[in-house]
Curated annotation (Swiss-Prot):
The protein's name in its UniProt record: UPF0758 protein NGR_c13970
Residue ranges constituting the MPN domain according to the UniProt record: 141-263
One GO molecular-function entry: metallopeptidase activity
Positions annotated to bind Zn(2+): 212, 214, 225
GO process annotations (BP): proteolysis
This protein's UniProt keywords: Hydrolase, Metal-binding, Metalloprotease, Protease, Zinc
Family recorded in the similarity comment: Belongs to the UPF0758 family.
Location of the motif JAMM motif: 212-225
């Protein structure tokens, strides 16, 4: 009977290579467990649970702005530590209002914010604006002035170009329509009084509130703002249409031209 050939003796260099390979795999596994906090979960999962519990038990007063933004980002970016992203967004845009009001392309310039996340943030901003706008429906707008300002600020304060908006009111001063009449450049919006009055007649509006933003952040009215407002008021008056106010929106405040008696 023929004996099988003996197994070759392992080469010392091959044995050393195998030991090194398996040692590296063990080290990598230990590093992964350490990164996951020794529990098989990423270290930020425990932080997320604690943050949610704090909000559930104590409400928003217990959270900083970056905590609130981080809670939102948890859902949008489930497999990543979102605290640095939340802090970077606030550093870039200043406030929660600034983050949600920022244009999509600027949001995407922040590391970790892709197109889908930017769109979701804008969707949240849209929901907030519509909520504020719904507060104006079927109400006398002049008796809900703070709601008007809140809505205009949410809709316009962080636009990067000037935007001229008109709130059309009926004889009860209830909101009929809210329309952006014109969009312009960073410091100018062309507005045509005849077109404003024409649209008011089409909607059977009897009163208007004019609003536009100053992307510079300073809501001080310019000479052109004052002259344009006077022209609209003069064109509307003979047709029984009242211009209640022209509000200029800045990032941190607003100016009522009626309050300053500028027209």
């Amino acid at each position: 009977m023929t004996k099988p050939p003996p197994f070759p003796e392992p080469d010392d260099s091959e044995t050393a290579d195998e030991r090194q390979f398996f040692a590296q795999q063990k080290t990598r596994k230990l590093d992964t467990v350490a990164t996951l906090g020794g529990t098989g979960e990423a270290h930020y999962h425990g932080h997320r649970d604690r943050l949610r519990a704090r909000y559930r038990e104590q409400g928003d007063a217990a959270l900083a702005d970056y905590d609130i933004l981080e809670l939102i980002l948890f859902r949008l970016i489930p497999r990543r530590d979102t605290k640095p992203i939340a802090k970077e967004l606030l550093a870039r845009f200043g406030t929660l209002s600034g983050v949600f009001g920022a244009p999509q392309h600027l949001l995407q310039e922040v590391k970790g914010v892709g197109e889908a996340v930017a769109l979701d943030l804008k969707l949240i901003a849209t929901a907030a604006q519509r909520t504020l706008k719904s507060e104006l429906r079927n109400k006398q707008v002049l008796s809900s002035w703070s709601a008007v300002i809140d809505y205009c600020h949410a809709a316009m304060a962080h636009e990067t170009k000037e935007q001229f908006r008109i709130l059309f009111l009926d004889k009860r001063n209830a909101l009929i329509a809210d329309e952006v009449q014109q969009q312009g450049t960073i410091d100018h919006t062309p507005v045509y009084p005849r077109e404003v009055v024409k649209r008011a007649l089409e909607l059977s509006a009897t009163a208007l509130i004019l609003a536009h933003n100053h992307p510079s952040g300073d809501p001080t009215p310019s000479r052109a703002d004052i002259e344009m407002t006077k022209l609209i008021a003069e064109a509307a008056k003979p047709l029984g249409i009242t211009v209640h106010d022209h509000v200029i929106i800045g990032k941190d405040g607003h100016v009522s031209m009626k309050g300053l008696r500028l027209f």
